[in-house]
From Swiss-Prot:
Name of the gene encoding the protein in the UniProt record: MRT4
Compartments reported by the entry: Nucleus, Nucleolus; Cytoplasm
Full protein name: Ribosome assembly factor mrt4
Gene3D superfamilies tied to this protein: 3.30.70.1730, 3.90.105.20
Transmembrane portions of the chain: none
GO biological process, one term: ribosomal large subunit assembly
Amino acid sequence: MPRSKRSKLVTLAQTEKKGRENKERIFDEVRQALDTYRYVWVLRLEDVRTPVLQEIRSAWAGSKLIMGRRKVLEKALGGTRETEYKENVSGLVKQCEGMCGLLFTDETPETVTAYFREYRKADYSRAKSRAPLRVEIPAGVVYSRGGQVPAEDDVPMVHSLEPTLRNKFKMPTRIQNGKITLEQPYLVCEAGETLDVRQALILKQFGVAAAEFRVKLAAYYDGEAAAVEEVRINME
């Protein structure tokens, strides 16, 4: 039985209420943190994966990391001199782009910059990013790492994945003697090539984590000095 228009409106209202409550929660948390910690750092965390975010939160357990979109963070910080919650904190707003994190801490700027200069995580390349290296799957039996390691250190890819390789990833594979095989080498991507969704999925399937995730530091606010300092860490 089709849903009535009324039920759809109720569902939409519930969704809007939840979104509004989340924005209000972030607003309150930001202002409370501004009253608690001396420094506020703008971390650019576009496309950050959940395990990475959890690791950063764990490493900075004595501090507070709040994630949010620019509009929400701008409202909490105050985007102008007239609306800013703390003197000159509105200067941070222009540094917030896309999905950002605000790290509230009492650790010194030297400690923060040293940590994030060194922090990096191997990551899978995403669609629309550039391929970090040339990847070609050798002809013959298809191994789980796709030729990245010697065959004696690898295992053949399980035969149940053959339909996925052939139908979803469009690789010309077939089953021969119970193993997935390629008659010819299969080029996945050239180094520097812009990846599409299919190529990114193939790289992930074969465990090619050659990309690198780094946190970009844009600026920080010092509550005692009431000043914003631009730092530009990992912005290259």
